Amino acid sequence: MTWLSGLYFISIASLVFCVIGLILSGVILISRKLLVKIHPCKLKINNDDSLTKTVDSGHSLLSSLLDSGIPIPSPCGGKATCKQCKVKIVKGADQPLETDRATFSKRQLEQGWRLSCQTKVQHDMNLEIEERYLNASSWEGTVVSNDNVATFIKELVVSVSPEHPIPFKPGGYLQISVPAYKTNTSDWKQTMAPEYHSDWERFNLFNQIIDNSLLESGSANKAYSLASYPAELPVIKFNIRIATPPFINNAPSPNIPWGVCSSYIFSLKPGDKITVSGPYGESFMKENNRPLIFLIGGAGSSFGRSHILDLLLDKHSTRDITLWYGARSLKENIYQEEYEKLEKDFPNFHYHLVLSEPLAEDIASGWDKNDPEKTNFLFRAFELGQLSKLSNPEDYLYYVCGPPLHNSSILKLLDNYGVERSSIILDDFGN
């Protein structure tokens, strides 16, 4: 009976501990309500009274504008890394933060330029906002499918109203709004093929509770490049990678949260409603006859597909187009069949797949692990297979999108070959 008594004591102690924790949490929340006085603040935009918004104090300027129907772009989700949520505060600007000083010149800071994601609304402000952001809109869409196309990447397919099409351009992006939610990663198996389960099980990624049920309205928005091209409307597509915590002993760190936006998207099922806003973007196609080289890795597949399918299937471009796509293994490769068909149908399109870590089954199926143009890091394979053979590499346009290390390696490589930065179109959300 001794061990039963001990177990009983532990259970009672655990219950008491949980109750105390709940009481303390409640006290903290109530204290915040009482101590932090919330008051209305007016945001006057472009000196136009009709655009004035009244918001509650205490929130970020970015979330206040988003809640007011002004979809300021924030591709990084408000982490101050993309530097795209810039707003000019002509009256009422507080002292700049270090993130502002790292973004703007001294003169710009004096003029009132700030990152809206880092600016707290505490009083009335007069703002200058670009017209293109004021003209951005929001759409409600219905999830058609949300299947994994790689172990940690989903293809989110959404249908929007054909009566109100989204006027986006290839290379553009939309922001996805994230409501309060709670999810269990085991439920994600519903939209994940069994072939991807083993890696998730190996890293103990299933049965993880992600609780963002107290998420503040308008506080979470993340921009994602469109994988679709305009002719595919009213359907839009995204390739989205899950942001897991770092792994410790083959398990996600319990002290670091999962990505708020990507976890929400991974939880979506067919029939669910989502809200997108935009369109935004700077990494559009340069309309000239220069040959094109796409250097794409991982979930950068969105950016590459949107441009390439639009050029070939919609615009019937005769420009020379080469795609180098890097993945770990064939299981992680995205849109292979689609690109192989395009290569057969269009003599001006050339497709190169590079694997950095081919699996045993890949090699058994015929993948050449000894060919450095096929089994390598993408930037090295590209240099061996094409770049080093170009007589005038500066004559090409390079469209680059992928993980941070991929992007930095490509930029350094192209710089070594004398390619001007103006010839490189980088889609980088500051991840």
Swiss-Prot record:
Class of enzymatic activity (EC top level): translocase
BP term (GO), one: sodium ion transport
Subcellular location(s) per record: Cell inner membrane
UniProt membrane topology term: Single-pass membrane protein
Cofactor notes: Binds 1 [2Fe-2S] cluster.
Domain FAD-binding FR-type: 136-286
GO cellular component: plasma membrane
UniProt GO molecular function: 2 iron, 2 sulfur cluster binding; electron transfer activity; metal ion binding; oxidoreductase activity, acting on NAD(P)H, quinone or similar compound as acceptor
Names of the cofactor(s): [2Fe-2S] cluster; FAD
Family: Belongs to the NqrF family.
Its job: NQR complex catalyzes the reduction of ubiquinone-1 to ubiquinol by two successive reactions, coupled with the transport of Na(+) ions from the cytoplasm to the periplasm. The first step is catalyzed by NqrF, which accepts electrons from NADH and reduces ubiquinone-1 to ubisemiquinone by a one-electron transfer pathway.
Protein name: Na(+)-translocating NADH-quinone reductase subunit F
